[in-house]
Amino acid sequence: MSNTEIVVVGAGVAGLSAALAVAGTGHDVTLVTKAELVESNTYHAQGGIAAAIFSDDDPKLHAADTMAAGHGLCDPKAVDILTREGAERVREFAAAGVHFDRDAHGHMLRGLEAAHSRARVVHAGGDATGKVFELDVSAMVRKNPRIHIIENAFLKDLIVRGGHIAGVHLLIDGQDKDLAADR
């Protein structure tokens, strides 16, 4: 059985973000993905990302728009987290080098879409935001020496001990492999 400090399963935006966040705290992390690193649902996502990151906007306004568009079906706490932390993540990824669409002066472009009261939808590569995001963030992950990547590994099961996840049981090239994790 191999051992790692922390394991993250999945190489979409959530998994890549988690791996980078863990590595940023000084911990080693193993990122496990069922295909090539860039092959995820994020890669195929089209459209843009709504984020209240501009001076004429605020996450609370974004939350109000989301609640109104949801016609009472949205969880207010989840909407608050999404609009507040989502804006923070978009700023972080823009600063880290994700190639969001920009004008001739280098300002991030934004559009007014759907039920938004402010122009807050940003794109990368036009309508290929997911592809650009996945490629850019995957490159950041590959360059990070604290992140070990295991590609083409199918997650068969979680290893649970004492009610806590203690690792993952993987299928790699037809062979079973257990990867123990401290966290």
Language-model-derived ranges and their functions:
Residues 24, 172-174:
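A generic beta-sheet turn/junction motif
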Residues 11, 153, 182-183:
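Structural detector for helix-capping/boundary residues
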Residues 34-172:
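Conserved N-terminal/central alpha/beta ligand/cofactor-binding core
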Residues 2-4, 175-183:
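Core beta-strand elements of the Rossmann-like FAD/NAD(P) dinucleotide-binding domain
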Residues 2, 25-26, 136-139:
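Noncatalytic alpha-helical scaffold of FAD-dependent oxidoreductases
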Residues 5-31:
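N-terminal Rossmann-like FAD-binding beta1-loop-alpha1 element of flavoenzymes
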Residues 7-8, 17, 99, 167-169, ...:
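Structured core elements
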